[in-house]
Curated annotation (Swiss-Prot):
Protein's job: Metal-responsive transcriptional regulator that represses transcription of cadA and the czcD-trkA operon by binding specifically to their promoter. Binding of zinc causes the repressor to dissociate from the DNA.
Keywords of this entry: Cytoplasm, DNA-binding, Metal-binding, Repressor, Transcription, Transcription regulation, Zinc
Name recorded for this polypeptide: HTH-type transcriptional repressor CzrA
Pfam families in alphabetical order: HTH_5 (PF01022)
Superkingdom of the source species: Bacteria
Species of provenance: Bacillus subtilis (strain 168)
Listed CDD domains: HTH_ARSR (cd00090)
Cellular component terms per the entry's GO annotation: cytoplasm
Main location: cytoplasm
UniProt: Zn(2+) binding residues: 90, 92, 103, 106
Statement: the UniProt record of this protein carries the keyword Electron transport: no
Residues annotated as transmembrane: none
Further information: Can bind copper. It does not affect DNA binding but it inhibits zinc-mediated regulation.
Amino acid sequence: MTEFRETEQSAADLDEETLFLVAQTFKALSDPTRIRILHLLSQGEHAVNGIAEKLNLLQSTVSHQLRFLKNLRLVKSRREGTSIYYSPEDEHVLDVLQQMIHHTQHD
């Protein structure tokens, strides 16, 4: 039998906005390209061209995915000269991502 931990809020207490944002976050994590980008960013800050090069992706693809992730506040950016550097906005989502990676690799 599976036991569920008690949380501060029951499922019935979740408001529509919270449900929507949680669903959007899982949607973000459902895309292999976004997972690869987040995993790379979990190792340190990178510029768009560096992400594209390391992941063998087009810069336009990386920029599009970073916009998506930034809109969900999963990544943040900072400008240095002509380059924009990206890093994780919040470690919580990275923790979930790492747990899922570990879960899928577990025998």
